[in-house]
Amino acid sequence: MTVRPDPRSPSTRDRTLRGGSIGPGGYRRLTTGAGEPWIVRTLDETGPISGHISGPIRQERAVGDGEPLLAIAHLSDTHVMDCQSPARVEFLDRFLHPDVALPSATGDDGRTYRPQEPLTTQVLDAMARSIAAARTGPFTGRPLDLSIVTGDLTDSAQANELAWLAAILDGGRVHPDSGDPGRFEGVGCLAWHDPAYWHPDGGPGDIARDRHGFPLAPGLLDAARRPFTAAGLGLPWLAVYGNHDGLVQG
């Protein structure tokens, strides 16, 4: 049986997110790029593939024949974070590199702080809405059966982080705020100005803006902790335990 995809289903077959041009300090905005080809991976021949996996896996283009048995939406490392928690340890970064606040351009080097951290609930909500809009597998056209989240649902093993994640995936009211109701209380706030962290509301200079070209985004931190209603996946979902789900910051 040949099954055709639903042309209305958005997926990375159509377009992808890419890093845009790099500014003088290293900051870059996201842009859209070309879609990715469909690749079938089977277990009947040996041979290395790109990335971290090698072994009995063969790659070939799918021909579209056969009957699909299951369609799964895969999420991983969502790292829903309470960035106002007193258990955060961003201050440890200064012992690693005292004069540099941000991760290196070549990858993760053990840092505990990333400027986009206040937005983890909104990012996951956008992911859930995209999956709900897709409705079907992008190649087979089979309706999605379930979603699997493969580890690190939360960033720091906190109950409120897990509650926010469940509300987003199930659908419901989400209030991603654990601090003073009247103000943001994470490291990017103006009240506790530290140049090691990005301050989107402005104020005195910081390394992210002055050295790396990060923009101003007034009101971002208050918007990040504002309540919202998540539509949910519209699917059953299963989760796998990750190190960040059992340990403070993993």
Which residue ranges define each predicted feature?
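Acidic, histidine-bearing metal-coordination/catalytic regions of metal-dependent phosphoesterases
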Residues: 1-148, 154-241, 246-250
